[in-house]
Amino acid sequence: MTVFMEDLTQQVVSSASPYVWSLVLAFATVLISIALLYLARFSAKLEVKDLADLRSMFDRFPAWGKRASWAQQNSFEAFSLHAPAALLAAIAALNGQTLPTIASLAAFAYPALRLAYICAYVFNVPLARSLCWLLGLLCSGVLYGVGLSALLA
């Protein structure tokens, strides 16, 4: 009986792993965007007086640093949309629902698209940035749709 339960537990947990990894990797892209922002802050030569008004230092950022700041802000917004979608899909998988392959693809594509989005933003490639943003949003939408339909079935 114990071997059966361990095998069953391993199967259930592994079915949720694409969505959990999506969540972990998506958070890693948020951390990358924060690191780029701090790199921009150091290139703007942070001074003691800036501690009283950090936003005024933004004017001294190089152009790429300003874009890194905007990418970082968007990373928090995008993560707050994606995290519930990934959790919803993970919960559906943990409940024994078999999710379609497109859900796993969307889960793994999302962090890659967010990383590409950040790079496109910092390097000022607006068309690629917009395309990555849209595709990332669609990936989150797929996870919401698949997760909800699996849980409501």
Give the ranges of each region predicted by the language model:
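Alpha-helical transmembrane segments of multipass membrane proteins
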Residues: 29-37, 81, 117, 140
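Membrane interfacial helix-start motif at the N-side
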Residues: 12-16, 58-80
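Short, strongly hydrophobic alpha-helical membrane anchors
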Residues: 1-16, 153
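Short alpha-helical packing/oligomerization segments
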Residues: 84-112
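Juxtamembrane boundary at the C-terminal end of a transmembrane helix
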Residues: 143-153
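N-terminal signal-anchor transmembrane alpha helix
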Residues: 14-54
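Interfacial loop-to-transmembrane junctions
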Residues: 115-139
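Core segments of transmembrane alpha-helices
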Residues: 30, 74-89
